[in-house]
């Protein structure tokens, strides 16, 4: 498994897949998840980790998306922060 696959697998398992398979998640939320996956796939492992940290730091788009995720009661990047940091920060080097 490549570094990129490892990161995407982790985020898919813990954040993305539960939303995409949810019968109650809004269309806007599912579209946002698909867009995030698309953007992540365009990056190498270092870029994926940087994208994750930028989303947590807050961009205008990521702040609104995180608010929507919170409103709908789904797991967010913030919820997997500790494990993500432990597993993937090494890819920034």
Identify what each model region corresponds to.
Residues 56-93:
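Amphipathic alpha-helical binding modules
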Residues 1-32, 81-92:
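Short terminal alpha-helical segments
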Residues 2-11, 51-68:
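Short cationic/low-complexity microdomains
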Residues 17-60:
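Amphipathic alpha-helical interaction modules
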């Amino acid at each position: 498994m490549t570094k990129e696959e490892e990161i995407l697998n982790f985020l898919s398992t813990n954040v993305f897949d539960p939303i995409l398979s949810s019968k109650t998640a809004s269309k806007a939320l599912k579209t946002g998840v698909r867009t995030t996956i698309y953007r992540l796939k365009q990056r190498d492992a270092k870029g994926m980790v940087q994208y994750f940290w930028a989303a947590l730091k807050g961009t205008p788009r990521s702040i609104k998306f995180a608010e929507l995720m919170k409103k709908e009661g789904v797991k967010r990047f913030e919820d997997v922060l500790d494990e993500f940091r432990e597993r993937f920060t090494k890819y920034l080097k």
